[in-house]
Every structure is written in C-alpha cells, then in structure tokens.
Amino acid sequence: MAKKKTQQKTNAMRMVEQHKVPYKEYEFAWSEDHLSAESVAESLGIEKGRIFKTLVTVGNKTGPVVAVIPGNQELDLKKLAKASGNKKVEMLHLKDLEATTGYIRGGCSPIGMKKQFPTYLAEEAQQYSAIIVSAGKRGMQIELAPEAILSLTNGQFAEITTKE
C-alpha cells in the first residue's frame, strides 16, 4: 500500500489549525531573485494589494515590533514608532531575523514567531475579507481573515504605510 504524501506544516500553519481558524494554503516556485510580494502575487495570479509582507523592526523602547503591510506599499517607520509607543523604530538587521523570529527572509510569517512581539497590521487589510501572508516557509503562503491574524498575534490595526 502506497503511503500518502503528507504536507509539511509550518509553525504558522500549526498555530492556525490549533486555534481552528479557517485558512487556504498556496504553494509556488520561488527563487532568491524573486522573493518580493509582487513576485508572489504574479506567481499566484492574485492582486498585489492582497499579498501582505511581514517586516520586523526594532523599537527604542519595545524591542522587536512586527509590521504587516500590503506588498505594493512601503512601511512608514515614523507612523509605526508612534503606533507602537516608540520614539523611533528601525528595520531589524537581516542577519538577526532568524534568531529573533525563527523565520528567514522570504518566509517570515507574522504568526508563530519564536516569541510574541507587538504586531501591527496595516489598516488597508480591513477592506478585504481575507489577505495572504507567508506561511513561514519560502514558497508557501496562507490566506485568512485579517481579524484572525490580529487574534493569533494579539495585534492591532494601525496606519503604518506611506501615503502617496
């Protein structure tokens, strides 16, 4: 009897399932040159605004702060600092990402990090019933309700993107 191939679950997927949150999983071929949210949107055939990227910053008072923003927008560090109660925040050095979060560049999910950090989801997420974030592994994404992300991360909506 042939064994059924089992899908490897990430920490993010296990946490979502543990809390009985409905989600949809996406897989795509990735490369080191194509880790951007735009590349993911193109690979999946989904509008760029629904693909959200997870950025990890460091606040002068709070330490690590997680920002989840639309892939087609940029993080406003001043707005994130204000929302998180810091005087300033700066991007976490890439070399520190895995040690801090348990995830690597291109596979960083806001869900299931090593520790729970203050998490801010861009208010733009409220216009969608579901958004897509990294599942915690390159080439894997999960789609779930923005409110579910906030619940799983104890996060909150905030105005944290640059407005053109």
Curated annotation (Swiss-Prot):
Keywords, sorted A to Z: Lyase, Protein biosynthesis, Transcription, Transcription regulation
Gene3D superfamilies noted in UniProt: YbaK/aminoacyl-tRNA synthetase-associated domain
Record-linked InterPro entries: Prolyl-tRNA_editing_YbaK/EbsC, YbaK/aa-tRNA-synt-asso_dom_sf, YbaK/aa-tRNA-synth-assoc-dom
SUPFAM superfamilies recorded: YbaK/ProRS associated domain (SSF55826)
Gene Ontology molecular function: aminoacyl-tRNA deacylase activity; lyase activity
GO BP term, pick one: translation
EC number in record: 4.2.-.-
Organism superkingdom: Bacteria
Protein role: Affects the expression of the receptor, named binding substance, that mediates mating aggregate formation. Could be a regulatory protein that suppresses the function or expression of ebsA and/or ebsMB.
Family the entry assigns: Belongs to the prolyl-tRNA editing family. YbaK/EbsC subfamily.
PANTHER family, per the entry: CYS-TRNA(PRO)_CYS-TRNA(CYS) DEACYLASE YBAK, CYTOPLASMIC PROTEIN
Record NCBIfam families: YbaK_EbsC
Protein name: Putative Cys-tRNA(Pro)/Cys-tRNA(Cys) deacylase EbsC
Organism field: Enterococcus faecalis (strain ATCC 700802 / V583)
